[in-house]
Amino acid sequence: MQFNIKLQNDFKNNIRREWALTNGLGGYAGGSVTGAINRTHQGYLIASLHAPVQRYVCFSKTNEKIVTGSHTYDLSSDQFKGGCHTDGIQYIREFTYDGTICFTYEAGDITIKKHIALAQGKNLAAVAYEVQNKGEAAKLLITPLMNFREHSESSTVDSLKFEVQKQEHGFTLIPKAQDDHCIRIAFSGGELIERDDKYICDLEAQTEVDNEVPGLDCAFCPYDVSVDIPAGASMHFSIMCDIVPLEACNGNAGSAFAKHLVSDNESAFEILRAQLDYTDELIKRSGFIDDFAVKLTVAANQFIAHRQSTGYDTVLAGLPWFTDWGRDTMISYTGLTLCTGRFEKAHDILLTFAKYCKDGLIPNMFPDSGLKPLYNTVDASLWYFYAVYKYLEYVNTPDAYEFIKKDIYPCLKDIISTYKKGTDFSIYMDTDGLIHAGSGLDQVTWMDVRVGDWVATPRHGKPVEINALWYNALCTMDMLQAKFGDNDDSYRQLASLVKTSFNKRFWNENTGCLYDVVDEDDDTIRPNQIYAVSLPFTMLDKEREKAIVDTVMDKLYVGCGLRSLDPDHKDYHPIYIGSLSKRDHAYHQGTAWGFLLGGFISAYVKVNGRTKATALCADKLLDPVREHLLNNCIGSICEIFDGDAPHNGRGCYAQAWSVGEVLRCYCEDVLPMLPQAHS
């Protein structure tokens, strides 16, 4: 699995093409393929101090210069205030992503391959250099740009204050703002040269400028590292950086970290090789040989992280800023864990959310601060039933059923019981068996934008996808109670009532599709109705299902996602850019969402027949996603896209449910029926 990109010395058109790596703890690394930083949330080591939250930028990047004779080649790419930038991109011959990052530079007679990798399960970044010199002796000057800030904030000279401890082959930094941790950086050789100017400031992140915020950062640079490159030599050089509790830096610990690297200058390369082996193992476990499925499998892994508070794994909703959201986790769950053969992760994720079930609700989100979870969602608990159903469908062993019966089934029964009686956020079952949710300022469906007292998409009443999920949950419970010998036909009886009421209340003869919300009937054409066709248990006849899919195709499908609103609607806002207020107006009012492709493709295949011809058509519908993997975040899928052409990727540059749902629908509904796998 490899992406190779030629940049052609074009900084402006490549600055928004980004990359990301993750460490399985919620920590990550990221940058632009130009070598510059494009967002506040980027750097070579953004560590999670309390997995998977409390994320801090510790190591922003490295800049390099080659000095040969009287000539200096500046390989750095940085954008500064006002949009001016250094021109290191002219020396980049290729950018490569294969589970690690590699920039290939050519300057004069010297070729440098600069590899970046993260260790799994540690807050540790490795930068490994392969240097080939076909000419005269030269020097490689490396400037580490250090930092310490919460990953959504920016640094200034005043905020970047450290106690600096120099070692022979490295240094440690103790942040004065949080002196219970220290940052260690070590080099496999070279000479540390103290810099006169210890700060590089006014570093500008273009995406933040697009969003009408300053986007300026500052980095602390106490030393350069000078490495001799003999004439005609080939050599390796390593940098390792981590952040550890302060006690790990006491005494000679920081020096020992540096000495370890010096004694074995392959340490960074060992991390690099370990990450490549890890990526190969992910692919092997998935069983995929199809190129698209393989690439999505590698992307899927980036969202799975350990949660320290539960001791189990969870799913981060999106890179670079989201934490674990219940709704996003349950929607992405099948693609991220089951399609990829990671059944133990699937097991742990179900346990994580069962542990936090409260008043019939599973968490909407876990805040980045690590505080108590928030429960303001009606659909996360209902998507949980879908995840359980899929877990049993894929794993299908006696142990799997026993696990669900013992650890999950009580939670499921509590959810059904509580929804029937009523719970927080005006969530309750009405006399017609349908679920009502939301009131006032509460936003409890996925269309949840609220700014102060302004609610963009209130959707109070009985939303269409909530009641499709409710019916699916009741049918799932009926299946489970029969399997577990409960002899309880109440779920089946209630499901029958829901089916009758749903068909009576939601079908809109005027539009030939479903209302988005009843009882205050909202005939706005939105994508939520697709789940009334795509879920395992559904309520509509074939003619109505086909009409829904045709309407969604005609009005909402845009290649990499479905529009959140009919473009003919007066409130349609297709472009997600500018200030927060401008973006909030577009978020669910025209912006297209990648995750919705999953339900749409499944519904499309269902209504058109599971044939080779249908699979080929569905496969073609996914071609824009294949192209997208080479843009925005290389190898992954954005959270959202502009509703109007050219449908630029926006929001999180890598989103769990976008990746998970595209992978799920592809491996369930398309790939099995293709005449041959893509190579």
Where are these regions (language model features)?
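Active-site-adjacent "gating/activation" loops or surface patches in catalytic cores
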Residues: 297-315
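Catalytic cores of carbohydrate-active enzymes
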Residues: 363-364, 417-420, 427-430, 471-576, ...
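Extended, well-ordered alpha-helical scaffold segments
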Residues: 252-288, 292-299, 341-355, 399-421, ...
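Non-catalytic C-terminal accessory modules of carbohydrate-active enzymes
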Residues: 73-100, 107-111, 421, 550-558, ...
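Carbohydrate-binding/catalytic loop surfaces
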Residues: 310-324, 363-383, 387, 391, ...
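Aromatic-rich carbohydrate-recognition surfaces in CAZymes
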Residues: 133, 155-157, 229, 323-329, ...
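Short helix-capping and inter-helix turn/linker motifs at the boundaries of alpha-helical repeat units
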Residues: 119, 291, 309-310, 323-327, ...
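Terminal accessory carbohydrate-recognition/targeting modules of carbohydrate-active enzymes
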Residues: 1-288, 320, 327, 338, ...
